[in-house]
Amino acid sequence: MTRTPVNVTVTGAAGQIGYALLFRIASGQLLGADVPVKLRLLEITPALKAAEGTAMELDDCAFPLLQGIDITDDPNVAFDGTNVGLLVGARPRTKGMERGDLLSANGGIFKPQGKAINDNAADDVKILVVGNPANTNALIAQAAAPDVPAERFTAMTRLDHNRALTQLAKKTGSTVADIKRLTIWGNHSATQYPDIFHASVAGKNAAEVVNDEKWLAEDFIPTVAKRGAAIIEARGASSAASAANAAIDHVYTWVNGTADGDWTSMGIPSDGSYGVPEGLISSFPVTTKDGRYEIVQGLEINEFSRARIDASVKELEEEREAVRALGLI
């Protein structure tokens, strides 16, 4: 194996999602079965010991592709020469916490990380923000990294995309492999809009197969949007393995490309497409090739979809104004 290892940084590495993610990265599922990796685990100081325990387990797996592990609490060290950064660590919302407090707390995490990426990362760096509120955390990090092309900062809506695939498959008696061209629009929040109007199920238009707008509005959309809360209710903990899986999917697709005739959903800086204000990090339908993504153009947006996209975009604009007022962007 003569390939130069890819440096992959994972923040919040000792957490639940980090634990579900790291072994899959080290086994080759993030970038490909022939791509060696070096891991950089970034944690807050009190969690370094737990991160060391995870690193011990990674060593004990003897993954042929894993060519080194560094553990640090210094973002400048963690992002030195980074090619792929998975920003998982974030401040979760606690009971009674106002949204402004949440945004402020996360600004204290993502602004310094953005600067560290700006100052230290490799020229080809790709960033995926997983930690919530993911879209706006990505915006904060991106604003702190003016020397890095804006399109390198993305937010994860692939979990919502995957959730929607399964719900649609169940409704139509098909499998997820039968479904193509599903879209998540907007924010990774309860306002997100999973859109089946351009999707296909075994080659047939998904909306026509379903033929039930009441189910879409009252069942499908809320089920996808509130799935995280339902998992916390059932499991007593937030979704970790499914979030890690979606992060793997997001980066793998970004690097290796979407299948012909299909697309995926990514939270990316808007170029003004579909009436989403430029610069907002919003979820769009995208195709990927050679490590680059492009927004799928020319989709007709019906009234049902337009109102829901606009509502989610409005929330993103409000979040942007809130972090601007806090001096975070």
From Swiss-Prot:
Gene Ontology biological-process annotations: malate metabolic process; tricarboxylic acid cycle
Top-level taxon: Bacteria
pH curve summary: Optimum pH is 8.0.
UniProt key word tRNA-binding: no
A Pfam family the protein falls into: Ldh_1_N
Enzyme category, top tier: oxidoreductase
Catalytic activity annotation: (S)-malate + NAD(+) = oxaloacetate + NADH + H(+)
Residue numbers annotated as active site: H188 (proton acceptor)
SUPFAM superfamilies, A to Z: LDH C-terminal domain-like, NAD(P)-binding Rossmann-fold domains
Residues annotated as binding substrate: R93, R99, N132, R163
Temperature dependence: Optimum temperature is 42 degrees Celsius.
Binding site for NAD(+): G12, A13, A14, G15, Q16, I17, G18, N106, Q113, V130, G131, N132
Keywords annotated in UniProt: NAD, Oxidoreductase, Tricarboxylic acid cycle
Activity: how regulated: Strongly inhibited by Hg(2+) and Zn(2+). Activated by Na(+), NH(4)(+), Ca(2+), Cu(2+) and Mg(2+).
EC number(s) reported in the record: 1.1.1.37
One GO MF term: L-malate dehydrogenase (NAD+) activity
Family membership: Belongs to the LDH/MDH superfamily. MDH type 2 family.
Function recorded in the entry: Catalyzes the reversible oxidation of malate to oxaloacetate. Exhibits remarkably higher catalytic efficiency for oxaloacetate reduction than for malate oxidation in vitro. Highly specific for NAD(H). Can also use NADPH for oxaloacetate reduction, but catalytic efficiency is 97-fold higher with NADH. No activity detected with NADP(+) and malate.
Protein's recorded name: Malate dehydrogenase
